[in-house]
Swiss-Prot record:
Record-linked Pfam families: Peptidase_M17, Peptidase_M17_N
Protein name: Probable cytosol aminopeptidase
UniProt family annotation: Belongs to the peptidase M17 family.
Active-site residue list: K268, R344
Length: 490
């Protein structure tokens, strides 16, 4: 999508579809301004009792001949309450109102109380992301008439700087959405490795794929235990972005890569949504999407290592048993008291490997626990961190990306719930505080001197009904936060 700032007055703008946001109480004033160009606007507002309330929308076809072909007025609610999230929601609504029109979408919102760069970026991201639709698996995809260009009306020319990362960031989100949404007979461990190979080729990154024998040689017993019930070979993926010039910061992004999770012998039953366990590789999709964006944006001075331990968790005669004891790459022995808590086993070896790269900070993303969904719902991810500066940076990055993120406690006293009679630790603790003990388990495989954060995306990885910038389905959650975090350190 072509993105630009327009200095043209809204009354003179001549694109294909014009969307104007109206705060509550403002419609009459705006209507007077628009009336000279679009006769009948005032009467239409009165007939529809349009007051500018949040969610109100009025679609007009004001000009019999010429552009714009469509004029859309959307209500924004109280003017004092229009924050950046309100701008984002309004831009998403504008995008939906533009469906059916090709050409250029013009958007005017009350930008004045916001930094121009920020307003431009979030508006453009919201428009592109909310127009996304996945029709790859349909015999006859519906033809969609969509805008090919977006002009933000009324922002200063300097706001164009905010548009520069938008298309690259959104492309990363879209890649993550495609990976999460695709069924597990399409997205396999090998398919994730192929995706990484394509990124390495397209953006000049370095790629290492460890096969089963390589992982055995490195002692990755936790990861391999999860994989042994599947006929599909595991893939351990290490993708590296190296900037031109000196490296000031080295970062690691680790994603959980379970391309299908049956639960193993602790089989998912009842309301466990086994049919949706294709999204258990959502963490790997997020880090792959982030690497796609980073590869295009090329942040200076920041080296980024992406690590994904990918496999399936299946049931056969070779599958891991409840009660088995396995050994991670650092020699830690783990009693598997629940085969459906497999993600943390794969992440244990992935985190150990990531820390071997001597990063300044490690962030892992995983659809790890239902407990986090119960606590925070499906619009927010929870995160745990051992470092205040990293936590603050992630909060800032998530806020800028419009992704809900809430810090959770790393309460050390809960670690006793992971104590095993026979091994160094168990892979699950008691049900209460389950997301906390999961984070404490992961922390055991992070170097003590390494800043680390674990983000549990089990809730926001998928949206059943869609909301805001996310159509129904895979959301691509985490990509914007990661891209913002990495680029902020350039």
């Amino acid at each position: 999508m072509r993105l630009s700032i327009s200095s043209t007055n809204v009354k003179e703008w001549s694109g294909d579809v014009l969307v104007v946001g109206l705060p509550k109480g403002d419609p009459s004033t705006t209507a007077v301004n628009l009336e000279s160009r679009f006769p009948g606007v005032s009467s239409a507002l009165n007939q529809q009792a349009f007051e500018g309330k949040t969610g109100q929308k009025l679609v007009l076809h004001p000009l019999a001949n010429g552009n714009p072909q469509r004029l859309v007025l959307i209500g924004l609610g109280d003017a004092d309450a229009i924050d950046l999230d309100g701008i984002r929601a309004a831009a998403a609504a504008a995008a939906q109102a533009s469906i059916g029109c090709k050409g250029c979408l013009g958007l005017q919102l009350p930008w004045d109380s916001h930094h121009p760069d920020h307003a431009a970026r979030i508006s453009a991201e919201a428009v592109r992301l909310s127009l996304y639709a996945d029709q790859r698996f349909q015999k006859e995809p519906e033809e969609r008439r969509l805008p090919t260009a977006l002009e933000l009306i009324g922002l200063p020319a300097s706001a164009a700087a905010g548009l520069e990362p938008v298309n690259a960031t959104c492309a990363g989100v879209e890649l993550a959405r495609e990976l999460v949404a695709a069924p597990p007979n399409y997205v396999t461990p090998a398919a994730l490795a192929e995706t990484a190979a394509a990124l390495a080729h397209d953006y000049g990154m370095e790629l290492t794929i460890l096969e089963r024998a390589d992982c055995e040689a490195r002692g990755m017993g936790a990861f391999l235990a999860v994989s042994q019930g599947s006929d599909l070979p595991p893939k351990f993926i290490h993708l590296i972005y190296r900037p031109e010039g000196a490296v000031k910061r080295r970062l690691a992004l680790v994603g959980k890569g379970l391309t299908f999770d049956s639960g193993g012998y602790n089989l998912k039953v009842g309301g466990a949504q086994i049919d949706m366990m294709k999204f258990d590789m959502g963490g790997s999709a997020s880090v792959l999407g982030a690497m796609r964006s980073i590869g295009e944006l090329k942040p200076a001075g920041v080296e980024v290592h992406m690590v994904v331990a990918s496999c399936e968790n299946m049931v056969n005669g070779s599958a891991v048993h409840p009660g088995d004891i396995v050994t991670a790459a650092n020699g830690t022995t783990i009693e598997i008291n629940n085969t459906d808590a497999e993600g943390r086993l794969t992440l244990a070896d992935a985190l150990l490997y990531a820390c071997e790269q001597k990063p300044d900070a490690v962030v892992d993303l995983a659809t790890l626990t239902g407990a986090c969904v119960v606590a925070l719902g499906d619009e927010m991810a929870g995160y745990w961190s051992n470092n205040e500066a990293l936590a603050e940076a992630l909060d800032t990055a998530a806020d800028a990306g419009g992704e809900g993120l809430w810090r959770m406690p790393l309460r050390q006293s809960y670690k006793k719930g992971l104590k095993s009679l026979l091994a160094d630790m168990k892979n699950t603790g008691p049900r209460p505080g389950g997301s906390i003990t999961a984070a404490l388990f992961l922390k055991e495989f992070v170097s003590q001197d390494t800043a680390w954060a674990h983000i549990d995306i089990a809730g926001p990885v998928w949206s059943d009904k869609g909301k805001g910038v996310n159509p129904a389905g895979a959301t691509g959650y985490g990509v914007r936060t990661l891209v913002n975090w990495v680029c902020a350190q350039a």
